[in-house]
Amino acid sequence: MKLVIAEKPSVGAAIAAVLGANEKRSGYFEGSGYLVSWCIGHLISLADAATYNEQYRKWKYDDLPIVPQDWQFTVASGKEQQFSVLKDLMHRSDVSEIVNACDSGREGELIFRFVYEQANCKKPFSRLWISSMEESAIREGFSNLKDGRSYDDLYQSALCRAKADWLVGINATRLFSILYHKTLNVGRVQTPTLTMLVNRDYAISSFKKEKYHVVRLNAGGVSALSERLNDEAAAQQMKAACEKSQAVCTSLKKEKKTVAPPKLFDLTALRREANRLYGFTAKQTLDYAQALYEKRLLTYPRTDSKYITSDMQDSTKELITGLCSLLPFMRDVKLQADLTRVCDNSKVTDHHAILPTAEFLKAGFSSLADSETKLMTLVCAKLLCAAAAPYEYEAVTAAISCGGYTFTAKGKTTLCEGWCEIEKLSRAASEEQDEDAEPETVLPPLAEGQTFDNPAAEISERYTQPPKAYTEDTLLSAMENAGKEETPEDAERKGLGTTATRAGIIEKLISAGFAERKGKKLIPTKDGYNLAAILPEVLTSPQLTAEWETRLTGIAKGSDSPDDFMRSIEEMTAGLVKTYSAISEDKAKLFTPQREAIGTCPRCGAAVYEGKKNFYCSDRACSFVMWKNDRFFEQRKKAFTKAIAAALLKDGKVKIKGMYSTKTGKTFDGVVLLADTGGKYVNFRVEQNRK
């Protein structure tokens, strides 16, 4: 009997159906000599600090750095039952072999190995490596199972990454939270991402726009621009000179240019385009893609490759033929598919690019939600564009001389629409416009030496523009490329985060209060600014990730030592704790919430603030305080709210509805007066207005 362990229930169910394991049990399928179960993602994780020592439940500087010598693991909360199922299955006497069917790559390896180790399993295991949930792909994968132990170095790389993130995250988060009296989540990926947001927002807010002028010359249907002019008088002089002169085309340059078809989608590219066109967040795009994958309509979405392998060419061309028949906007397009640009075995590691499946050709869009339809259309259109001919055009640059000045006119003429035709048709069919698309400017026929009488000139006043705020589209791109120049070419991961985790990083920054969404823009908050300012560069720069990936790639290849890597991480963590042992009192107040005065003290004129139990005067020498549990309000069964306190401070009275009368047992409306006599306690009284 073989036990197959998938990463998710949906994947397990799909594999079970193909293998003929059709008998549903509690937490697994059985049949045809197979048991098929699943992990529910990260079933086992590194234990938290308190597992090692109960005193770590309280965050204290003296306990830092926390460096486990004997690492411990724990079952994820709420997933205990499924781990128990897997453990029992692993130890069944009739199970002779285990198949690791978790996602291919570093994290999938980690997920399986953690379960295998936690269950104390010693049985041999093999590795399933597939990129599609289609039946043919699953069958082929099982006919080519690999030796599980050949991935030991990959597992060590994954384990080192997990431990290093734990050490930096736990210690840096506790260190800076203790120093600044606020929970400050610090992470190797999250913090540099926040810093990029802060740097961009600061560049925008500190940008000083500068005015400049441009003279536009209109001659014989040609519109040509001058260079930038900082002086308005110079622009006026140019305009006057041109209107008295004849214009001449002094040079004409024509150049044929080609724009190659786009590559296929990896997850980051899909997220970027979905955000730009539809406003989908990165998390939404992954959720929609995952749902399509589980419906067998889309290949594995968490890929970082934009290529297919050579053995996929024939099946991919069949997909293209089917899409041309399925998609209405392709009916009049003659497409001769060429996949050579996106076929590269060396650039497909864990999984190939995101593609529609053959199952989608049968099912179509009929059962899909609107969001899934949009995403599926993007993937289909990208495949068709990638297989189409290049876009070819003629670029024309003309120099026009007039009044002693030179102007430039640029235009282009399409020679072959190629893949751009498909992109335009796809956009039109979905009624979406690409805001970044540039309009095509066509120049009239021109020749060198051609003259133009009575040219017209006009002055345009313009301003330099600040950088644009990050959107999820542009931030994902920045994360993908951060630190790339320092990362080895063959590293499994480049940039900040992975194709699968970047969305979670953005969401975490928002939920922690360090960033916020304003429309499509991502903006850092005040706390985000402060956090980026207080942390050392080693935590705010993508350099750390680049260095780690260099080492982790070496570990995965067997050329670097896991022990040496972990020793360097421990030394870095200890150095952080030692360097940041104390801060000034002013810095410690950076994350203190800004207090908002609710009114003015009737005794001394100082500001009155709301506390947990009272409303108090900010002048410590003044004894004015109104208690929220004042018996006056409790007897009348009314909460002493901030709004009531503010009204009393402003007007000395407030109208309150539904107060309870202890004499009549009924409610009444009345005006409450602030009857302060300057004593230890503030008094209140009612001018009743009974119903």
Predicted regions span which residues?
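Conserved short loop/turn motifs at secondary-structure junctions
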Residues: 1-3, 101-104, 181-183, 254-263, ...
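Intrinsically disordered, low-complexity regulatory segments
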Residues: 1-162, 166, 465-466
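Basic, low-complexity terminal or inter-domain segments flanking catalytic cores
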Residues: 2-3, 79, 90, 173, ...
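C-terminal or mid-to-C-terminal helical accessory/interaction module adjacent to the motor/catalytic core
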Residues: 137-217, 254-255
